[in-house]
From Swiss-Prot:
Interacts with LY96, TLR1 and TLR6 (via extracellular domain). TLR2 seems to exist in heterodimers with either TLR1 or TLR6 before stimulation by the ligand. The heterodimers form bigger oligomers in response to their corresponding ligands as well as further heterotypic associations with other receptors such as CD14 and/or CD36. Binds MYD88 (via TIR domain). Interacts with TICAM1. Interacts with CNPY3. Interacts with ATG16L1. Interacts with PPP1R11. Interacts with TICAM2. Interacts with TIRAP. This is Toll-like receptor 2. The chain crosses the membrane at residues 588-608. InterPro entries: Cys-rich_flank_reg_C, Leu-rich_rpt, Leu-rich_rpt_typical-subtyp, LRR_dom_sf, TIR_dom, Toll-like_receptor, Toll_tir_struct_dom_sf. Residues 525-579 form the LRRCT domain. Residues 639-782 form the TIR domain. One of its GO terms (biological process) is inflammatory response. Residues 1-20 form the signal peptide. GO terms for molecular function: NAD+ nucleosidase activity, cyclic ADP-ribose generating; transmembrane signaling receptor activity; triacyl lipopeptide binding. PROSITE patterns: LRR, TIR. Pfam families: LRR_8 (PF13855), TIR (PF01582).
């Protein structure tokens, strides 16, 4: 029994493990190009069943703890492997041995406490390696990256345990585009550890304290293009002039990101600018200045300039003691060579006039997202301020008057580009004054609802996007580029107002159409962006847009951003794909064709009615309907005649002199109804015929060639035909006065023809000896 239980337990474990592996494999989603996504799937191991078809594998943000030698051995074509944000603590020696095509490897933020060079010995084409955020203290006992000749991006270190950098650590690396070292607790830096790298385009250093910063600078200053310092407290930073003064430098850019300064350490950094002569650009991003700006007692006055720095960028500068801050007059002399300054989102409300006057080389000034107003701008743009300034950006400040803003900037004689977007101007005056060389103006997101002659006529580029404009009727003879998206325009501007326009972006308005003629009127237009509008996909619009093969070269957002809004059955479709029916596009032609078809149908109907006696059928139908209103069969008391006689006028002699004499003078006499004698004068002939036939017991037809051609006889025969058809009786008596071909009786009298074919009729004998028998038979037929 225990053995049976043991066997069952083993099989259960095998089944569960198989199901688990199957579940993990199924948790990957792979596309046809070999890109497999398995991130954030709660995987605790690398899925089995991976093949050579996998080219990119993302297993980040899972719970994987172990990478074995066989886990990836079939992925011989793998180029990208992401294993970041797992719990990996062990990677076997040959885990990546078969990945000879691997170019991107991310092992960041795991639990690796030891690194092995054997992991990378076959990764000759590896270009990107991220080892950040693990638990190792050093980069291994041997040179870790000596087998990676093509490595371009390397990220190493962590924020806690990584404390040592040794000379062997980066041996074998010659050129790096980016090197990131996270070493907040760095305690040991062996000189020349980074010296072996001949060129580094961008070095990112995470250092909590600046103790070893100068030592690192000594090693890299001749091989580095850009140094970025992150998360560092520079309160105790001291720059040693002797350490770098005699060395050639290649550093062109310094970036300080989330760095804390004091007045003292800031002066030390300024000294660095002087001695590292190659620095052209300095950037401070999200930094904090823990001081009051009192640099006079710190020998800053002995520094005459900022070295060769031409570009200064400051973003999100925090000054906790802002209200105690000095006037910065001590740094004015340092700014003479600076050409480009950006101070963004730093609560700047004023640039002192003296500082503006010292910025004699300044060509570009960006004061976006600050607190500048017309009152403070007046002081900043004082006489002789920024004499060579060409571009001024005052985006998202507190400017309110467009007229006053333009007037205050008249002192800037060389200004040609002005960005005052995202200020609340609301309206535009009729006239304004601007610097004489103004060529570019940005008024986007300023809530203006109309444009006036306030705009300078010298403009070549105008941006009025994201406002409340519903029309554009300004004459700007030199304008080359117009940006007017996200407004309320219903049509394209008049080309005669903009004779040299080459670029127009007018997307997301309420334009519903434009024509070939409109586009052709812009003779120099090369770029048009008009997507995101509510286009009415009319036949003309579709014919124009779908028939112009070269349209895609002008419409930069064609075809995806051009969608139909109407008609409803094509709403949401791309204009390029929309199709309308023939009736929608050629309505006049369709109506004309329909009218012609209707005329032909009527003509054909008329011909057929004439050919097949359709008019007769309609007349008889009307007569029959009238007859249907009356009793189906008249009561006996309404029968006034023994017989109604239908005959041709040309046969009247035989009827009136022979038949009437024989029947009405017979004893007992027969009462006959003759149209000449008994029809009621003034009554409609059809009614006379109907009444006479209905009041007669029988109807006698005296058939002859004359009868067939008689119009009167036709009416009598017509209604009699309907009576025979409707009542199905034998009230008709046919007398053949002379031999007549049955074919002479019209085809439409099918019932009468049938009677002649199936029943006997009386034939008037030419032989007088047989005439007495004829009358005898006729009287018998009438009585029947």
């Amino acid at each position: 029994m225990p053995r049976a239980l043991w066997t069952a337990w083993v099989w259960a474990x095998i089944i569960l493990s198989t199901e688990g592996a199957s579940d993990q494999a199924s948790s990957l989603s792979c596309d046809s190009t070999g890109v497999c996504d398995g991130h954030s799937r709660s995987l605790n191991s690398i899925p089995s069943g991976l093949t050579a078809g996998v080219k990119s594998l993302d297993l980040s943000n899972n719970e994987i703890t172990y990478v074995g030698n066989r886990d990836l051995q079939r992925c011989v074509n793998l180029k990208t492997l992401r294993l970041g944000a797992n719990e990996i603590h062990t990677v076997e020696e040959d885990s990546f041995f078969h990945l000879r095509n691997l170019e991107y490897l991310d092992l960041s933020y795991n639990r690796l406490s030891n690194l092995s060079s054997s992991w990378f010995r076959s990764l000759y084409v590896l270009k990107f390696l991220n080892l950040l955020g693990n638990l190792y203290k050093t980069l291994g006992e041997t040179s870790l990256f000596s087998h990676l000749p093509n490595l371009x991006t390397l990220k190493v270190g962590n924020s806690n345990s990584f404390t040592e950098i040794h000379e062997k650590d980066f041996t074998g690396l010659t050129f790096l585009e980016e090197l990131e070292i996270s070493a907040q607790n760095l305690q040991i830096y062996v000189p020349k550890s980074l010296k072996s790298i001949q060129n580094i385009s961008h070095l990112i250093l995470h250092l909590k304290q600046p103790v070893l910063l100068v030592d690192i600078l000594v090693d890299i200053v001749s091989s580095l293009d850009c140094l970025e310092l992150r998360d560092t407290n520079l309160h105790t930073f001291h720059f040693s002039e002797a350490s770098i003064s005699e060395m050639s430098t290649s550093v062109k850019k310094l970036i300080f990101r989330n760095v804390q300064f004091t007045d003292e350490s800031f002066v030390e950094v300024v000294k660095l600018f002087n001695y590292v002569s190659g620095i052209l650009e300095v950037e401070f991003d999200d930094c904090t200045h823990d001081g009051i700006g009192d640099f006079r007692a710190l020998s800053l006055d002995r520094i005459r300039h900022l070295g060769n720095v031409e570009t200064l960028t400051i973003r999100k500068l925090h000054i906790p003691q802002f209200f105690l801050f000095h006037d910065l007059s001590s740094i004015y002399p340092l700014t003479g060579k600076v050409k480009r300054v950006t101070i963004e989102n730093s609560k700047v409300f004023l640039v002192p006039c003296l500082l503006s006057q010292h910025l004699k080389s300044l060509e570009y000034l960006d004061l976006s997202e600050n607190l500048m107003s017309e009152e403070t701008l007046k002081n900043s743009a004082c006489k002789d301020a920024w004499p060579f300034l060409q571009t001024l950006v005052l985006r998202q400040n507190r400017l309110k008057s467009l007229e006053k803003t333009g007037e205050l900037l008249l002192t800037l004689e060389n200004l040609n580009s002005l960005d005052i977007s995202k200020n609340n101007f609301l309206s535009m005056p009729e006239t304004c004054q601007w610097p004489g060389k103004m060529k570019q103006l940005n008024l986007s997101s300023t809530r203006i609802h109309s444009l006036t002659q306030c705009l300078p006529q010298t403009l070549e580029i105008l941006d009025v996007s994201n406002n409340n404009l519903d029309s554009f009727s300004l004459i700007l003879p030199q304008l080359k580029e117009l940006y007017i998206s996200r407004n309320k325009l219903k049509t394209l501007p008049d080309a005669s107002f903009l004779p040299v326009l080459s670029v127009m972006r007018i997307s997301r308005n309420i334009i519903n159409t434009f024509s070939k003629e409109q586009l052709d009127s812009f003779q120099q237009l090369k770029t048009l962006e008009a997507g995101g509008n509510n286009f009415i996909c009319s036949c003309d619009f579709l014919s124009f847009t779908q028939g112009q093969q070269a349209l895609g070269r002008v419409l930069v957002d064609w075809p995806d951003d051009y969608r139909c809004d109407s008609p409803s059955h094509v709403r949401g479709q791309r204009v390029q794909d929309a199709r309308l029916s023939l009736s929608e596009c050629h309505r006049a032609a369709v109506v004309s064709a329909a009218c012609c078809a209707l005329f032909l149908v009527l003509l054909l109907t008329g011909v057929l009615c004439h050919r097949f006696h359709g008019l007769w059928y309609m007349k008889m139908m009307w007569a029959w309907l009238q007859a249907k209103r009356k009793p189906r069969k008249a009561p006996r008391r309404d029968i006034c005649y023994d017989a109604f006689v239908s005959y041709s006028e040309r046969d009247s002699y035989w009827v009136e002199n022979l038949m009437v004499q024989e029947l009405e003078q017979f004893n007992p006499p027969f009462k006959l109804c003759l149209h000449k004698r008994d029809f009621i004068p003034g009554k409609w002939i059809i009614d006379n015929i109907i009444d006479s036939i209905e009041k007669s017991h029988k109807t006698i037809f005296v058939l002859s060639e004359n009868f067939v051609x008689s119009e009167w006889c036709k009416y009598e025969l017509d209604f009699s035909h309907f009576r025979l058809f409707d009542e199905n009786n034998d009230a008709a008596i046919l007398i053949l006065l002379e031999p007549i071909d049955k074919k002479a009786i019209p085809q439409r009298f099918c019932k009468l023809r049938k009677i002649m074919n199936t029943k006997t009729y009386l034939e008037w004998p030419v032989d007088e000896t047989q005439q007495e028998g004829f009358w005898l038979n006729l009287r018998a037929a009438i009585r029947s």
